[in-house]
């Protein structure tokens, strides 16, 4: 489900971070007052897995699902936003909604609704329907800068560690342990999530005083581990070229 307090309307639930833990529940017991976001996986008989999701989603609101009782699901889409306002340091929130869901040009393609069926969980992982249905990238696209890999990540794993021989939290030392772990296990990257830059002003050039970023970059380079810096749209859009060039030089 969307991570929200009970009692929130659908319009209030449209503003969310799309972060939550999975909930295993019978379709008939889904909370009709809450929205579920995609992908949704259904356990059918004899180990069969059914996944519901979308592909090629551009200029159109993503689909939520809402339980209707029994085995019925209803699709719900956010209306077209009218105006945006800041809501906290990182978030822009819709001020109001129109009575339609999208503005489209003549001939615009709409997203695919995908229902994938697999014999088991392994086959589900191998399914490439979303990729097959997506618009191919331009054949002249330069992909040389894309370097895929696994990451060691602190956001979901929690910073507040106990029983360790270093100061836990968002500071230089724990990130060195993450780098050591990544190097030891063939993990290509670590992610430094929210907190490496000072949050109060959403300024990417105000580094958390407990973090020595240049030291960490040098340390990671020595172990052949890359560092990915998380940044909010609100903070990076102020001067993207300056931010990118500044951190690319490290």
Cite the ranges covered by each PLM segment.
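N-terminal accessory beta-strand-rich subdomains and adjacent acidic, glycine-rich linkers
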Residues: 1-138
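Bulky hydrophobic/aromatic packing residues
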Residues: 96, 100, 109-111, 142, ...
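An acidic-aromatic substrate-binding cleft motif
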Residues: 105-185, 189
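Substrate-binding cleft of carbohydrate-active enzyme catalytic domains
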Residues: 151-250
């Amino acid at each position: 489900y969307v991570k929200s307090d009970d009692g929130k309307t659908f319009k209030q639930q449209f503003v969310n971070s799309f972060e939550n833990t999975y909930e295993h529940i019978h379709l008939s017991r889904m909370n009709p007052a809450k929205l579920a976001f995609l992908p949704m996986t259904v356990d059918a008989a004899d180990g069969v897995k059914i996944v519901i999701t979308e592909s090629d989603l551009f200029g159109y609101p993503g689909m939520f699902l809402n339980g209707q009782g029994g085995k019925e699901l209803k699709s719900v889409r956010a209306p077209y936003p009218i105006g945006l306002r800041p809501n906290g340091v990182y978030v822009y929130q819709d001020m109001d909604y129109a009575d339609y869901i999208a503005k489209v040009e003549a001939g615009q393609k709409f997203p695919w609704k995908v229902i994938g069926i697999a014999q088991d969980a392994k086959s589900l992982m191998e399914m490439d329907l979303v990729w097959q249905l997506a618009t191919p990238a331009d054949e002249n696209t330069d992909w040389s800068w894309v370097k895929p890999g696994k990451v060691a990540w602190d956001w979901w794993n929690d910073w507040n560690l106990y029983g360790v021989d270093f100061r836990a939290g968002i500071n230089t030392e724990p990130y060195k342990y993450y780098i050591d772990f990544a190097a030891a296990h063939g993990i290509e990257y670590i992610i430094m999530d929210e907190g490496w830059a000072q949050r109060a002003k959403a300024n990417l050039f105000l580094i958390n005083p407990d973090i020595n970023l240049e030291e960490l970059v040098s340390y990671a380079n020595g172990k052949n581990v890359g560092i990915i810096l998380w940044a909010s749209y609100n903070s990076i859009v102020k001067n993207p070229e300056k931010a990118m060039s500044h951190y690319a030089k490290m």
